[in-house]
């Protein structure tokens, strides 16, 4: 009886995961902040996929201007703000104002707001000037943008990157909006990027890219 109950529970969880994943593919949109906070701060998730993996290909950020698109509740941006140091600046943008508020609260608690700028805006039209960023970071967020606008979002990321800048994208398979690596490579090339490096481990990958014409 217990075995049957356990199998039934696993089956229900499996069906629930499939339903969430299918819905994420058919109706891409930002994850609600309450769910995002649980998902991004969950110790089990952080132990396997945390800021270290997300920023592995970003290089030394000391003194740089680094933008994260889709900050969520600020887990990755907090680490970025620490890494840029007092001589650098971290920036974050999210379309959800409550996510930006959570991020501001998190960074304020760690004394990092003096080196951080936040904005509530669409990833397709960001408030920063052309070539103003050294790095742009996107973590499990491109899939939240409707399919027809993903290349446009990548081009907007390229717009704010300076001539030596680097775009770093990380995807985590359990995320309902996961984009597979081959598809991500195609999207980047369509947006005018060339691939610099790829890091992979089970369930996740990170890819870095530069705008076409840059010396890699």
Predicted regions and their residues:
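Hydrophobic alpha-helical topogenic segments used for membrane insertion/localization
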Residues: 2-23
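Conserved alpha-helix/loop element of class I SAM-dependent methyltransferases that forms part
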Residues: 45-62
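Conserved SAM-binding loop of SAM-dependent methyltransferases across substrates and taxa
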Residues: 73-85
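Conserved SAM/SAH-binding beta-strand->alpha-helix loop
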Residues: 96
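Conserved SAM-binding strand-loop segment of SAM-dependent methyltransferases
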Residues: 111-123
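A short acidic, Gly/Pro-enriched loop at the edge of an enzyme's catalytic core
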Residues: 124-136
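A short glycine-rich, Lys/Arg-flanked "PGG" loop and its adjoining helix->strand segment in the class I
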Residues: 151-163
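Conserved beta-strand signature within the Rossmann-like core of class I S-adenosyl-L-methionine
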Residues: 164-171
């Amino acid at each position: 009886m217990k075995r049957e109950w356990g199998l039934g529970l696993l089956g229900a969880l499996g069906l629930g995961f499939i339903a969430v994943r299918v819905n994420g593919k058919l109706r891409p949109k930002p994850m609600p902040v309450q769910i995002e906070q649980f998902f991004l701060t969950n110790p089990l998730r952080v132990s396997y996929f945390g800021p270290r993996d997300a920023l592995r290909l970003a290089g030394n950020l000391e003194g740089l201007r680094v933008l994260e698109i889709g900050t969520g509740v600020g887990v990755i941006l907090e680490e970025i703000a620490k890494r840029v140091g007092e001589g650098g600046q971290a920036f974050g943008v999210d379309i959800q104002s409550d996510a930006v508020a959570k991020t501001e609260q998190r960074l304020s608690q760690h004394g990092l707001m003096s080196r951080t700028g936040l904005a509530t805006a669409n990833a397709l039209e960001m408030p920063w000037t052309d070539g103003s960023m050294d790095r742009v970071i996107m973590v499990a967020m491109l899939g939240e943008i409707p399919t027809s606008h993903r290349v446009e979002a990548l081009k907007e990321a390229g717009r704010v990157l300076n001539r030596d800048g680097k775009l770093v994208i990380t995807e985590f398979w359990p995320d309902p909006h996961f984009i597979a690596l081959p598809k991500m490579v195609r999207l980047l090339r369509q947006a005018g990027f060339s691939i610099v490096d790829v890091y992979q481990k089970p369930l996740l990958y990170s890819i870095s890219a530069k705008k076409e014409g840059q010396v890699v």
